[in-house]
Amino acid sequence: MANHPLTLEKDGFIVTTLDAAMAAAQKNSLWYMTFGLARCAVEMMHAAGARYDMDRFGMIPRASPRQCDLMIVAGTLTNKMAPAMRRVYDQMAEPRYVVSMGSCANGGGYYHYGYSVVRGCDRIVPVDVYVPGCPPTAEALVYDLMQLQRKVAERSTHSRPKLFARP
């Protein structure tokens, strides 16, 4: 028998692990909801438009947090809006991811010293990827979303305890 790697064309089957299958499925089906609060939200709309087309990466916008596993926070987060953002995050499906887009969402930005500004959305929800810039370009958002996809694909089922927990 020849020493060759297993392929679908030669052997008629594919060998994989549950980790690899779950990672590939989840990586290519990130459904996102936008939490647009300022100018960065306009750049987020550009990324979802025809020129950059986030749909080709398997990222589909959803209106309900219960159908989403990715939240993109774009803009200045105020103290009054923080509880609403946390409530939306808690309603999202597990496993869930957060992208902080722009200087205001990352650390308060231009309004950092304002009395009503939260100095970074990572004080309210855990953030997986930060997109720098004021406002960040659509290219930067798409690049960081691809980095998030890589991060999701590298996770194993060991880090997803709720999905495979025994009753």
From Swiss-Prot:
Q: Where in the cell is it found?
A: Cell inner membrane
Stored InterPro entries: NADH_UbQ_OxRdtase-like_20kDa, NADH_UQ_OxRdtase_20Kd_su
GO cellular component annotations of the record: plasma membrane; respiratory chain complex I
Q: Which UniProt keywords apply?
A: Cell inner membrane, Cell membrane, Membrane, NAD, Quinone, Translocase, Transport, Ubiquinone
A Gene Ontology molecular function term for this protein is: NADH:ubiquinone reductase (non-electrogenic) activity
* Gene Ontology process terms (BP): aerobic respiration; electron transport coupled proton transport
Q: Which EC numbers does the record give?
A: 7.1.1.-
Going by the entry's taxonomy, the superkingdom of the source organism is recorded as: Bacteria
Principal location class: membrane
Q: How does it sit in the membrane?
A: Peripheral membrane protein
Keyword check for DNA damage? no
The chemistry this enzyme catalyses reads: a quinone + NADH + 5 H(+)(in) = a quinol + NAD(+) + 4 H(+)(out)
> Assembly and partners?
NDH-1 is composed of 14 different subunits. Subunits NuoB, C, D, E, F, and G constitute the peripheral sector of the complex.
| Function text | NDH-1 shuttles electrons from NADH, via FMN and iron-sulfur (Fe-S) centers, to quinones in the respiratory chain. Couples the redox reaction to proton translocation (for every two electrons transferred, four hydrogen ions are translocated across the cytoplasmic membrane), and thus conserves the redox energy in a proton gradient.
Question: What family does the Swiss-Prot or TrEMBL record give for this protein?
Answer: Belongs to the complex I 20 kDa subunit family.
The protein depicted here goes by the name Putative NADH-quinone oxidoreductase subunit B 2
**The species this protein was found in:** Burkholderia pseudomallei (strain 1710b)
- Gene (name only): nuoB2
